[in-house]
UniProtKB/Swiss-Prot annotation:
Additional information: Most abundant protein in the virion.
Subcellular location: Virion membrane; Host endomembrane system
Membrane topology listed for this record: Peripheral membrane protein
Chief location category: virion
The encoding gene: M
Lineage per the UniProt record: Viruses, Riboviria, Orthornavirae, Negarnaviricota, Haploviricotina
Protein function: Plays a major role in assembly and budding of virion. Completely covers the ribonucleoprotein coil and keep it in condensed bullet-shaped form. Inhibits viral transcription and stimulates replication.
Keywords: Apoptosis, Host membrane, Membrane, Viral envelope protein, Viral matrix protein, Virion
Assembly, per entry: Homomultimer. Interacts with nucleoprotein and with the cytoplasmic domain of glycoprotein.
Disulfide linkage: none
GO molecular function ontology, one term from the record: structural constituent of virion
TM stretches of this protein: none
Source species: Northern cereal mosaic virus (NCMV)
Protein's UniProt name: Matrix protein
Length: 174
């Protein structure tokens, strides 16, 4: 079993949905460590993988990293909980390639759904975040395969390196 820390590559296939509805800024919720941990905790992942998956996706959806790969559409709509709510729909890329410094990363398949609601003191819903990992797959790939993937679509590769031993992203120069 390889426990050597080295530069590796993780290929992530993402089939996910996320929408945020809120009435005012006080109702806005975000994808953060707590919501991601809750979402991934609802999956069938082995307990030993939960911490690694949570850390990876918390990093991936942190604001400084997410701006590299997520896009957001904004609209106004009503739903059963809120009238004329602002709606943000997060558009995930289908694939991501992440440069990674750490030990061998296990293959993972994550399927999970979670909804978070924020209420005002009267009990009315003023914010709602829906997260759905319809099917998210994580697989470590060789450097040769990573180069092939990058060459086929340069947009797959994030410009930031994920370092599992650190809590903050480190920007690397390509």
């Amino acid at each position: 079993m390889a426990t050597e820390v080295s530069t590796r590559f993780i290929f992530i296939k993402i089939d996910a949905l996320s929408t945020l509805h809120f009435i005012d800024e006080g109702g806005a919720l975000s994808m953060n460590g707590d919501s991601i941990e809750f979402l991934i905790g609802k999956s069938s992942l082995d307990k030993g993988l939960l911490k690694r998956a949570t850390k990876l996706f918390t990093w991936l959806f942190s604001p400084e990293i997410a701006k590299q790969h997520l896009s957001i559409t904004r609209s106004t709509e009503s739903n059963v909980y809120m009238t004329d709510a602002t709606r943000y729909k997060y558009i995930f890329p289908e694939y991501l390639l992440v440069r990674y410094v750490g030990t061998k990363f296990p293959d993972m398949k994550i399927v999970a759904d979670a909804t978070f609601k924020r209420r005002n003191p009267k009990g009315d819903v003023i914010g709602m975040l829906d997260l759905s990992f319809k099917e998210v797959r994580v697989k470590e790939v060789s450097e040769t395969k990573a180069i092939e993937l990058r060459d086929s679509n340069p947009g797959y590769l994030l410009s930031t390196t994920y370092r599992e031993s650190e809590s903050l992203p480190v920007v690397s120069k390509p």
